[in-house]
Amino acid sequence: MSKHVAVLLGGTSAEREVSLNSGKACADALEGEGYRVTRVDVGPDIASVLTALRPDAAFNALHGPDGEDGTIQGLLEILKIPYTHSGVLASALAMNKERAKTVMRAAGVDVPEGRIVNRREAARTHPLPPPYVVKPIAEGSSVGVIIVRDGRSHPPQILASEEWTFGEQVLAEPYIAGRELTCGVMGDKALGVIEVKAATGDWYDYDAKYAPGGSVHVLPAELKPNVYQRVQELSLTAHQALGCRGVSRADLRYDDTPGGTGLLVVLEVNTQPGMTQTSLVPEMAAHAGLSFGELVRWMVEDASLNR
């Protein structure tokens, strides 16, 4: 009998649409690989739904709070349902950007400097000299990220408004010029390195990530061999330091601008990277010789408890 896999998708976070797309792609691919699949749009009744289903494994295609912060992982541990991706602690750590930086820094991974400030304080006075970046402590997909350009006289006022729904504390970091790099990790191996370029502008924001034609992916990234290898080493070290399992993706900045610092830093580790057939990790896996179906099959067969 084929293995029964519950694909967890949707949810209620700001990344719901991304999760629906990831979940559909993974569910379709798993059916193509011969698994019996149930698509589960996650809501408040998720515990009773999974208790009734009793799947052999859960494929976690959720993004954002509740899906990649240790919450759903803890529930799956309680229900004794093996699941994909990282466990409770690694998920919670990686979702909190400042705490993740503390752990990565202790493991020798270069990360940006920065400080946590109250959002209203950051709307009154610049928390850092411009240019700098303000971001929610626990969101993904560039949701809520603001770049404050050099020469801007006033801090971003949206931080003091009711429109800001991403928490009272924000993370401010110096803006690092240069290139946006990303590297996936699968098990104990780093995949290829992609340079991501926004089709318009100089920032890889939510629209650049998900709108058709919003970005250009250069794979393999055109880097000196030693830099390429260093990106892979940093990504794998960050994955291991945070205790990640299965598949993750590290996002980095590399300042190779004329007269620049040469700085190479890990911005964050995504424990639930996008999983459509055109997402970054599947693209890296394909470059390494793995089809999308083979990738999701590996993830299901890697599923376990106590991750």
Swiss-Prot record:
Its main location: cytoplasm. It catalyses: 2 D-alanine + ATP = D-alanyl-D-alanine + ADP + phosphate + H(+). Mg(2+) 1 binds at residues 251, 268. Its cofactor is Mg(2+); Mn(2+). Binds 2 magnesium or manganese ions per subunit. Pfam families: Dala_Dala_lig_C, Dala_Dala_lig_N. ATP binds at residues 127-182. InterPro entries: ATP-grasp, ATP_grasp_subdomain_1, D-Ala_lig_Van_CS, D_ala_D_ala, Dala_Dala_lig_C, Dala_Dala_lig_N, PreATP-grasp_dom_sf. GO terms for biological process: cell wall organization; peptidoglycan biosynthetic process; regulation of cell shape. Cell wall formation. This is D-alanine--D-alanine ligase. It comes from Methylobacterium radiotolerans (strain ATCC 27329 / DSM 1819 / JCM 2831 / NBRC 15690 / NCIMB 10815 / 0-1).
